[in-house]
Design a protein with these regions (language model features):
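Conserved structural core of kinase catalytic domains
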Residues: 44-45, 56-113
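Conserved hydrophobic "DFG−1" position in protein kinase catalytic cores
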Residues: 18-19, 31, 80-81, 89, ...
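ATP-binding glycine-rich loop module of kinase domains
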Residues: 2-52, 56
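Catalytic-loop of the protein kinase fold
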Residues: 124-140
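C-lobe/activation-segment region of protein kinase-like
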Residues: 141-224
Length: 224
């Protein structure tokens, strides 16, 4: 199997590869095996187990997560390659062609309907993603299907108190609403904007910034 390095990783970060099998199919591989011994045997083992467990649970209930997840070793996992750009890349490509974000021509309304449906399915299964306000974490698969990647901030919610679970779910919902307001403002009501303001207030003042571990990234997220 051929592998191309996508992200070089680091002290706390997995190396990320695009691998191509003999059948020509591509997949993403995240590998902690080259991290220092203590990191790979503690954080690395935990993050590999955790992401594999979550994506396997979610793979049976929604198409909004990467499929085909397998645990390659105690320190590595693989998942299906999403054949499409991120929302961030889609926007930048369209802006270079002269399209304005608020024109309504970059993303169809069906994309955001599927975005909302995917979030609802994830929440019903007992999970929250918590980083869907970052346009790099939403891939645009063929047919305008959103796929949510980078699950290192995600949490299971099944045993949380109801008020906390709902507050965290609103963070995910606000991510979808943020992008709908940016790219299709004609579809957003005054009530939607008030909900977005409330969710952003909670995220900024009561939710600690996430610790970026487990996967190296480059560039900045699409600002709202």
């Amino acid at each position: 199997m051929d592998r191309e390095l996508l992200h070089s990783g680091g002290f706390l970060n997995a190396r990320v590869y695009v691998a191509r099998g003999e059948d020509g199919r591509k997949r993403i591989e995240k590998d902690f095996s080259e991290c220092p011994w203590l990191v790979r045997n503690t954080l690395g083992r935990f993050l590999v187990w955790r992401e594999t467990w979550m994506l396997r649970r979610l793979g049976g209930v929604t198409k909004a997560v990467p499929g085909g997840v397998v645990r390659l070793s105690a320190f590595a996992l693989a998942e299906d390659f999403v054949d499409g750009p991120s929302m961030r890349e889609t926007y930048f490509r369209a802006s270079r062609e002269g399209l304005k974000a608020a024109s309504g021509k970059i993303f169809p309304h069906e994309f955001f309907d599927r975005f909302d449906a995917g979030i609802s399915e994830i929440h019903a299964a007992g999970f929250v993603h918590l980083d869907l306000h970052n346009a790099r974490n939403v891939m645009v698969a063929p047919g305008w299907r959103p796929v949510f990647v980078d699950w290192q901030s995600a949490l299971p919610t099944r045993f949380m108190p109801g008020f906390l679970r709902r507050a965290l779910e609103r963070i995910d919902e606000a991510g979808a609403l943020k992008f709908r307001a940016k790219f299709r403002p004609m579809d957003v009501s005054a009530g939607d904007r008030r909900r977005l303001d409330r969710a952003n207030f909670f995220r900024r003042h009561f939710w600690l910034p996430r610790l970026r571990i487990g996967e190296a990234k480059s560039g900045s997220g699409l600002s709202g």
